[in-house]
Amino acid sequence: MRSVLPFRALTVAFACILGLAMFPLGTGAQEVDMNRYITLTVKKGATIVLSLSGPENNTPVRIVSGETDFTTSVDTTVGVIQRRIDAKASTLTIYGRVQCFDCSKNGENITALDGSHNGLLTMLGCYENQLTSLNVRHNERLTVLNCSSNQLTSLDVSHNERLTALVCYENRLTSLDVSHNELLTMLACYENQLTSLNISHNELLTTLACYENQLTSLNVSHNTQLYGINCSKNRISSLDVSRNTMLEDLTCNSNRLTALDLRNNPELKSLDCAANQLSALNLRNNPHLNMLYCYANRLTSLDVSRNTMLEGLLGHSNRLTSLDVSHNRELKALDCANNRITALDLRNNPNLSILFCFNNLLTSLDVSRNTMLEGLACHNNQIVSLNLRHNQALAQLHCSNNRITSLDVSHNSELQTLDCFGNQLTALDVSKNSQLTVALCWGNRLSTDAWNRFFCSLPDRSYMPNEQIIYPLDNRSDSQKPQVLAANGNIAKRKGWEVSYYNDGQDTPITGFTGSYQCTKIYK
């Protein structure tokens, strides 16, 4: 459901670009250029996997590591052929006119890379290793660098002025100077230890991922070409995106924002501003908004009437007393749980498949128009009745801790989880729920006879490899215990059901059933 920023996929695209090694049998008439070479610090005895390409077909290269010493040739063709090399020493050197070089995913077998003696390099991939140092100071032709998922504490790209894509996430960088990389269009430096990031000289940036650092501020006013920003999980207290009019995807969750002005972002499609300190959010100028994550803020109201393309709204854990989604006919997922909402009108949301509205003040809930509903969590409200006749796709139902006196699930043949504890039910029939695997139903008002009929209505699971489970009681003092123990719980056990006390994952099987009730044919 959640949108994926372009820079999330760029690492995969980069790997495809760099999977271009071709190793023909012949070396041609050319000689290896021994003045150009790349040196790796490797684990002696390890097998190193490389991919290479040259500026022309049949470019000769020589690979040396102790006793390993051979010459081969590479092409310009982008391919998927890789070369496996046995490291016979602690260094591995690749001589020749190598233009694209990829030594990624060798893990602890590569700890350092020096490409400074090969000025022809245009693309370098060395991600998912254990690099502690990387020297690209003399690689002035470099346009793409992916050194992510290593152990780098510093990275000097000041001499790589042609760089257009820099991917250096998941390292230990405390600083990053990209002031000399004015051609940069994509920067992914997330999951480092950066305390500041100056991108004022990178006016061509289109995607920026700097999340999970220690940034206290971020100035994107010079980056008017940006369409994707992810600066989440930092310490940013203010964010000005008024000049980023092309912005489509903004993820700034888990910061310290108290305000967010989106009036100049008409192209915005996905917004994640969750887990901040926002008390207001104006979305009237964002007609293309498709996904909204604004949960865990301090919102007292939320107007989404202009966001008619909205498919996902996650606004739980705020201070909302009402929520109007009558203009959001495309809505598929709504999470407004943990608020103070007293009423919820869902008649104009025919595409709704997920609804979380638990922990509110609802006294009623009409889902009769939501025929595509698959998951419903409305527990911890004050609902007195729940009509599920029209929700035939419903698979997950959580309606516990309400005031429901009867519950008809006979039309919900896809139901897998039934969570209805803490209500006022006097009967429960699941004979039509052939997919049911979990039932939490303690704390109701079922008599012993009603428990017997419930056990009889359970679908037969004796043929399944894993036991299904029902919870007629919880581990605390339960007033229903005498009625449950007087029933014949062995009926459920013979059908392959585990009958347990609910105890937050440390369930204890219920023993001591004294009933001898036998099911009638209607339940067989």
Question: Where would I find each of the regions flagged by the language model?
Answer:
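Conserved hydrophobic beta-strand positions in leucine-rich repeat
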Residues: 101-103, 124-126, 145-147, 166-168, ...
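Leucine-rich repeat
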Residues: 118-120, 139-142, 160-163, 181-184, ...
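Non-core capping and flanking segments associated with repeat-based/extracellular domains
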Residues: 145, 157, 178, 199, ...
